[in-house]
């Protein structure tokens, strides 16, 4: 499909720079093909669900994966930034480097020299390989938990580009850009639909008889990469590592068997479920990398509903929601959201989408 089919005008002021307070006070647009759009609040979610429904959350935890450093090559040096996006060994990460042209295989990079202290006072790495598009494989001098400790000391929360271009990250982001149920460290971007949930909302959902279960997909920085191709067939997704436990798989299959609805909280949860699912829609225990890229025409096998934030024009995530609820439906929903001053992107408002039986896109 042509990528420009997923383009729309988004006023810059509609991009949220901070989350709503409290988290569950954010707006939520309910979108069901063929029915009127319904303006609600995230706190209304329990009233829109029924006993026996299942919410599926991504419990990945964001790490401070943005690093500022100095590249040294002999006597020459230059400032560089690295955004880690996939761990491939206890001491090795794939990273997007800026500016990529300043690094080469064999370079030494000294991180943590921007005023922060870190474990042993420094965090050094060697460029093992240089890939395409500014990507590089970094081998750190520290490994395992020692590397993790150093990253927490010197790293910054990797805010999405459209937010980072407006302001620097701060201590507040370390809490704001993390779900309250995050537990499995490894993401460099938050599963942002989950940011809306509070203990009070969980209690209300429990009282309604709505189940919640967890999967893990370590969201990579590739989620922010722009689609540069003119056709979706020419876009390549970066792989992310995920897993579905036996406990969660059994719970989802049991819920579907008794007629309960599966509600994916966030596109990351949905992409992982679709990666794991069998043809008949059942979900096995699963783990591994996924680079699934969902566009209109895709046949969904798992979720009946999707809770997700409002995404950017021409993004792979807007393509996914268009596949889920229909391109025309989502075009109308986003026009309504912009006209009614919904807040977009990672810190923005939410939508609750019903799956279209057949894409109108």
From Swiss-Prot:
Keyword Thylakoid (UniProt): no
Cellular location(s): Cytoplasm
HAMAP family: QueA
Protein name: S-adenosylmethionine:tRNA ribosyltransferase-isomerase
Function description: Transfers and isomerizes the ribose moiety from AdoMet to the 7-aminomethyl group of 7-deazaguanine (preQ1-tRNA) to give epoxyqueuosine (oQ-tRNA).
Gene this chain is encoded by: queA
Native source species: Mesorhizobium japonicum (strain LMG 29417 / CECT 9101 / MAFF 303099) (Mesorhizobium loti (strain MAFF 303099))
Enzyme Commission code: 2.4.99.17
Any matching Pfam family: Queuosine_synth
Domain of life: Bacteria
Cited InterPro entries: QueA, QueA_dom1, QueA_dom2, QueA_sf
